Amino acid sequence: MADFEDRVSDEEKVRIAAKFITHAPPGEFNEVFNDVRLLLNNDNLLREGAAHAFAQYNMDQFTPVKIEGYDDQVLITEHGDLGNGRFLDPRNKISFKFDHLRKEASDPQPEDTESALKQWRDACDSALRAYVKDHYPNGFCTVYGKSIDGQQTIIACIESHQFQPKNFWNGRWRSEWKFTITPPTAQVAAVLKIQVHYYEDGNVQLVSHKDIQDSVQVSSDVQTAKEFIKIIENAENEYQTAISENYQTMSDTTFKALRRQLPVTRTKIDWNKILSYKIGKEMQNA
């Protein structure tokens, strides 16, 4: 073991540790971090070398965070990354410091947002919050209005999770929706992601994603927001239904094909008869 450690550079150790961390299942970051910490056995190297992995994990997972003094939770995403460890809360028009290891927000400060997109962002945010409240009991959302390559763009992010470590499973839903304000019709692009980990007496993961392409009629901000939400609702319902139907098909066909219906003799075993034979034989030998 010592020879192996001598051959592996600190840079390579950090690279391996970062891979483990960024691939941690939802709700299991702390467990993976603690295991990696034991393996690496160098806290300074881990914190300094793998800090980017902590940030990448939280942004990839759309980690929700509560900011003291504000009611709504905001999602940690690449779209809200302001640099230097600060993130944007576009709903409350503030920025805040985020500790990627402790997953805590601090130092909220007023933050200017793009005024040209304020009405559009607010309309989409209001409509999306109502949708998430109806469809995701544990869901959160954050909507951004940004100029990307000179085009005014709305980006809507949704996150919902269920962490049940006592029942040996954790899961998370993520979806990201974008459209550019270009009348009369705007292209809508999205990616939907599901990740579930079940680990009682085994280790099974569901990792699924689907890309969406659609279009929305651009009129007023409020009406466009309504049409945008209709597209989101239809696509996400179809995706969840398809996942459920796929599992039912697998249960009815694939999983059944994995086990033999009859033994090699092609004859069913009468276990009751075998048991009576065994009892009779034991009585004879008594």
Curated annotation (Swiss-Prot):
Q: Name one GO biological process term.
A: barbed-end actin filament capping
Indicate where this protein is primarily found. Answer: cytoplasm
Q: Name one GO cellular component term.
A: F-actin capping protein complex
Q: Which domain of life is it from?
A: Eukaryota
Family note:
Belongs to the F-actin-capping protein alpha subunit family.
InterPro entries given in the database record:
CapZ_alpha, CapZ_alpha/beta, CapZ_alpha/beta_2, CapZ_alpha_1, F-actin_cap_asu_CS
Keyword tags: Actin capping, Actin-binding, Cytoplasm, Cytoskeleton
Organism whose genome encodes this protein: Gallus gallus (Chicken)
Q: Where in the cell is it found?
A: Cytoplasm, Myofibril, Sarcomere, Z line; Cytoplasm, Cytoskeleton
The task this protein performs is described as: F-actin-capping proteins bind in a Ca(2+)-independent manner to the fast growing ends of actin filaments (barbed end) thereby blocking the exchange of subunits at these ends. Unlike other capping proteins (such as gelsolin and severin), these proteins do not sever actin filaments. May play a role in the formation of epithelial cell junctions. Forms, with CAPZB, the barbed end of the fast growing ends of actin filaments in the dynactin complex and stabilizes dynactin structure.
**Name the record gives this protein:** F-actin-capping protein subunit alpha-1
Enumerate the Gene3D superfamilies for this protein.
F-actin capping protein, alpha subunit (3.30.1140.60), F-actin capping protein, beta subunit (3.90.1150.210)
On assembly, the entry states:
Component of the F-actin capping complex, composed of a heterodimer of an alpha and a beta subunit. Subunit of dynactin, a multiprotein complex part of a tripartite complex with dynein and a adapter, such as BICDL1, BICD2 or HOOK3. The dynactin complex is built around ACTR1A/ACTB filament and consists of an actin-related filament composed of a shoulder domain, a pointed end and a barbed end. Its length is defined by its flexible shoulder domain. The soulder is composed of 2 DCTN1 subunits, 4 DCTN2 and 2 DCTN3.
The tissues where this chain's protein is expressed are given as:
Present in all tissues examined.
